Structures are given as C-alpha cells and as structure tokens.
C-alpha cells in the first residue's frame, strides 16, 4: 500500500482520490519549499509529511533550508516580531546583513523549480535571486498589524513574488500581488499525532515524571508571554480551590533570554506547588507531546497573541476539549460550546475548566466533535489538495 493510501482510514471519504486526480495534472513538475529550519513549527511538520507523498505521486518535491550567522538570526527574529506587531528597533546594518546573508544562501541553494514556496520571513528576500519559475511567499503568521516601517521594508521583497498565501482571512498585510488562503494542517499519522496505546502513554508520562492520579490540565506551547503561561497558572489556582487537579506546562524556550527568564519563573512556581509540572522539551519531542495531549483531561491554549495555533488542532484530533485564548487562528478552530471554548481572561478560563470538570459527558462530547471538525478541516490531506490546486493555478 502506498503512503497516500495510508490516509484513507483517517481522511474524509473521497479526499485521497481527489488528491490523486490533482496530482496527475502536476506530474513531472518541480516543487521547491524553502524554510529557515527543519525543526519545530507546523510548517516543518507538514513539509516532512507532504514532501514524500508528493514525490510518490510524481511531483518532484524538494526542501531547502537557509542558514546564517548570529547577526543574521538576531535580525531575522526581530524582523519577524515586528511583522507580527511587536515594537522592535531594526538597524539598517542588521537589515543589510539579513539581505546579504540571504544573497549568499541563494548562491548555495538549488533554487531551480517550476514553483518555489518560501516560508515566513527569514528566507523571504531570496526572491531577489529568482531566475525563472513561479514564486510564492507562504506566511504562517498574522501580519495584519505589522509595524509600519518594517512592513514597508519587507514588502519590497514580498511584492516580487507571484502570489502570497496566508493561513486565514484577515492575516494578510497590504500587498500588490494575488493573495490566497490555505489554512495549515497536521499530519494525523506522524509521531506527534499518530495513535499511542494506553500503555505507551503511561510509560512516556512516567518517564517525564507526570503522575496521572488526578485530572490533568495541559498546555503545550513555547514559554513565551504571548502564550500566557502565567495566566494559565492563575486559572489553575482558581480551579484548585474546587477541584484537585494537576497542571502541566510543556514547551521550549529556544534560548531566547526573555523566554528563559519566564521559564525560570515558572520553574520556581513548580517548586512551590507539586501539582504544577513544568517541562522544557526539545523541538523534536513529538512523542512526548503526543502522550501529554492524549493524557490530558482538558487542553489549554491560552494565547493572547497567536499565529494559527496548530497545537489546538493537534489536541482536537486526539479527541480533547480545548480552552483557548481569543487570538489568531484559535478562534477559527474552536467553535464555541461545540469543539471548545475561547476565553479572554483568567477568570473565564478557570470557569470553563470547572464547567468541563463538572460535566464529564459534555467534555467527552466536545472532544468527539472536535476530532471530527479537525478531520474535515485540519488534516494534511486537505492541505495537499490545496497545494496541488495552487500549483495547477500558478502553472496555467
């Protein structure tokens, strides 16, 4: 059985056959993706799964990664933050270094393809070196509130593309090129989302030091203020007055000083309360994340600022009720009182946690509905169809 056929048991009926028909039109074409890294993030996971499938279907698919020095990465991170709306000071020297380093990347990488998709901001200026083919900028974040100066600088490069693709309507900035919407997706058969036996889940949690003797509230997210882990702790404390629960906060700090400071504070909280577990996991800890989400009674994603927030879809696919912040793509995934709850405050988060703890049948039904909603809208099979349709459109 071919890899694409493995998805027939999880995808909506007819989806795989639709992909096969679209792939016939794209056979022999060369499809290139360029990212700033191979680890972490929904884009990387999608590409790891989609590339081999498309190649199997006769669409030559490659994945290149840009690199650089510390100054390059520092500027790239600051530029990304500014494009997401954060206040950042970007020096002309730093931006020039970013452009120059991508110029070096363009000379090192094989950029020859019929369609080249460049993901997010770090490698975006590669387009200046384009030599034939169609080029697409794939944005995975909300740039609708980008800082004016950085956006004006960045737009000079994005407008050189043939099209831009955004995860949701409303996430786009002002551009002079065609724009499309393709929501991201999860791979239901990956190590991060594939089935685990109850024994496997128990063994992984035991190795992580997470006891299962009481209901688990779980948030998996980078240790960043945008994901409000301190707000989650405060919501847990309110719930703890009424229910004996355990809170697990798992994620990465990525070596960022501000995130490391936040992680240090959370570790202090965990030392004072044995029912708060803080786990710093490497980006490749997919199996551990899978087990934590499956063991959760309730999954929380209390972001105050968010891109699409694929952690929500991951938890939904695992049949879990999710309480999320009213931010970014979380609101597109959580249908209020059907697949989960969106909240704006610590008190609201605590109230909805108590609602679900007090009504296990409601929590179970919400989890079932969440899984079906994810099946219809957020699996990689839908994403493959979208990309193949985009490929056909660009090559007409």
Describe the residue ranges of each PLM region.
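A conserved catalytic-core segment of Leloir-type glycosyltransferases
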Residues: 1-30, 48-113, 173, 182-189
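Conserved acidic donor-binding segment of nucleotide-sugar-dependent glycosyltransferases
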Residues: 336-347, 355-360
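Short hydrophobic beta-strand element within catalytic cores of glycosyltransferases
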Residues: 312, 321-324, 334, 342
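A short, well-ordered alpha-helix in the C-terminal region of glycosyltransferases
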Residues: 355, 362-377, 383-389
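Conserved donor-binding/catalytic core segment of Leloir-type glycosyltransferases
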Residues: 205-227, 233, 247-248
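Aromatic "clamp/platform" in nucleotide-sugar-dependent glycosyltransferases that forms part
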Residues: 304
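Short alpha-helical segment that forms part of, or immediately flanks, the ligand-binding pocket
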Residues: 290, 313-317, 331-332, 338
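Nucleotide-activated donor-binding/catalytic signature segment of Leloir-type glycosyltransferases, i.e.
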Residues: 259-291
């Amino acid at each position: 059985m071919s890899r694409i056929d493995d998805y027939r048991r999880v995808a909506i009926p007819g989806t795989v056959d639709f992909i096969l028909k679209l792939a016939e039109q794209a056979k022999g074409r060369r499809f290139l993706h360029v990212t700033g890294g191979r680890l972490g993030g929904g884009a990387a996971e999608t590409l790891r799964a989609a590339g081999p499938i498309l190649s199997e279907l006769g669409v030559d698919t490659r994945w290149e990664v840009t690199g650089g020095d510390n100054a390059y990465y520092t500027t790239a991170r600051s530029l990304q933050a500014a494009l997401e709306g954060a206040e950042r000071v970007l020096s002309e020297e730093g931006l020039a270094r970013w452009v120059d380093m991508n110029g070096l990347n363009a000379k090192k990488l094989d950029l020859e393809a019929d369609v080249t998709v460049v993901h997010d901001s770090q490698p975006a200026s590669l387009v200046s070196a384009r030599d034939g083919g169609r080029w697409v900028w794939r944005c995975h974040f909300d740039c609708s509130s980008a800082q004016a100066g950085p956006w004006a600088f960045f737009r000079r490069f994005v407008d050189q593309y043939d099209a831009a693709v955004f995860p949701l309507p409303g996430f786009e900035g002002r551009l002079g090129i065609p724009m499309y919407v393709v929501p991201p997706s999860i791979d239901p058969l990956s190590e991060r989302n594939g089935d685990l036996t109850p024994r496997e889940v128990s063994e992984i949690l035991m190795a992580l030091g997470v006891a299962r003797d009481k209901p688990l509230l779980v948030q998996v997210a980078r240790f960043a203020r945008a994901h409000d882990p301190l707000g989650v702790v405060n919501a847990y404390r309110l719930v703890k007055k009424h229910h004996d629960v355990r809170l697990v906060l798992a994620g990465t700090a990525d070596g960022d000083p501000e995130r490391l400071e936040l992680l240090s504070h959370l570790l202090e909280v965990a030392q004072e309360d044995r029912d708060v577990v803080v786990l710093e996991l490497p980006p490749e800890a997919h199996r551990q994340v899978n087990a934590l989400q499956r063991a959760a009674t309730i999954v929380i994603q209390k972001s105050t600022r968010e891109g699409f927030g694929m952690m929500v879809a991951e938890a939904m696919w695992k049949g879990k009720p999710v309480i999320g912040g009213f931010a970014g793509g979380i609101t597109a995934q959580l249908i209020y009182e059907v697949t989960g709850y969106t909240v704006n405050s610590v008190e609201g988060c605590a109230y909805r946690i108590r609602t679900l703890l007090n009504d296990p049948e409601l929590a179970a039904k919400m989890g079932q509905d969440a899984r079906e909603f994810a099946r219809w809208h957020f699996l990689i099979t839908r994403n493959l169809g979208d990309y193949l349709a985009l490929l056909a459109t660009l090559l007409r």
